[in-house]
């Protein structure tokens, strides 16, 4: 179906606004994936706070101009599904990675985070980023560990001091 100029401008404006507020973006090729599977992916994306859209490549090139995702321009070849993460930078990458494991025909092309393009082979860098809550939990565990270690060293020094006396 042909789009008129106003429709194209509306699509570019809408997706550009989403891109400006996004933390990361992932580009994939969904050729050969059934409609049912794509519907499941879109539902999971909505639950994870990920905006997904299939947009013509020429329009996508205009969408990413002036955004941190401009580095993805070369990946807009063939059928392109793009996902923008708003709540957590690794959400879209994690979603696409899990979906690609279950669907062999789904191919991740690349991702972008803070203006840096991440090739599909290195998508784990983005997908394994801890969430905010996970990062806080790790920090607290490290701090708790350090305090416990300091207590043990203090008690050992006190014991050594008493043995010496």
Swiss-Prot record:
GO terms for cellular component: large ribosomal subunit. Coiled coil: none annotated. PROSITE patterns: RIBOSOMAL_L10. Gene3D superfamilies: 3.30.70.1730, 6.10.250.2350. GO terms for biological process: translation. Keywords: Ribonucleoprotein, Ribosomal protein, RNA-binding, rRNA-binding. The keyword Coiled coil does not apply. CDD domains: Ribosomal_L10. GO terms for molecular function: large ribosomal subunit rRNA binding; structural constituent of ribosome. Belongs to the universal ribosomal protein uL10 family. Forms part of the ribosomal stalk, playing a central role in the interaction of the ribosome with GTP-bound translation factors. HAMAP family: Ribosomal_uL10. Part of the ribosomal stalk of the 50S ribosomal subunit. The N-terminus interacts with L11 and the large rRNA to form the base of the stalk. The C-terminus forms an elongated spine to which L12 dimers bind in a sequential fashion forming a multimeric L10(L12)X complex. This is Large ribosomal subunit protein uL10. It comes from Serratia proteamaculans (strain 568). The lineage of its organism: Bacteria, Pseudomonadati, Pseudomonadota, Gammaproteobacteria, Enterobacterales. The gene is rplJ.
């Amino acid at each position: 179906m042909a789009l008129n100029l106003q429709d194209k401008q509306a699509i570019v404006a809408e997706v550009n606004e989403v891109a400006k507020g996004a933390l990361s973006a992932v580009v994939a090729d969904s050729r050969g994936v059934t409609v049912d599977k794509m519907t499941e992916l879109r539902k999971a994306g909505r639950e994870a706070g990920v905006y997904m859209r299939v947009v013509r490549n020429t329009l996508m090139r205009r969408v990413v101009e002036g955004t941190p995702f401009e580095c993805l321009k070369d990946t807009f070849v063939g059928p392109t599904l793009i996902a923008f993460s708003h709540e957590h930078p690794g959400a879209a990458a994690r979603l696409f990675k899990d979906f690609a494991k279950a669907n062999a025909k789904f191919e991740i092309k690349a991702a972008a985070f803070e203006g840096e393009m991440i090739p599909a082979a290195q998508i784990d860098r983005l997908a394994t980023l801890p969430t905010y809550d996970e990062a806080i939990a790790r920090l607290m565990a490290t701090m708790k560990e350090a305090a416990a270690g300091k207590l043990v060293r203090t008690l050992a020094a006190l014991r050594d001091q008493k043995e010496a006396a």
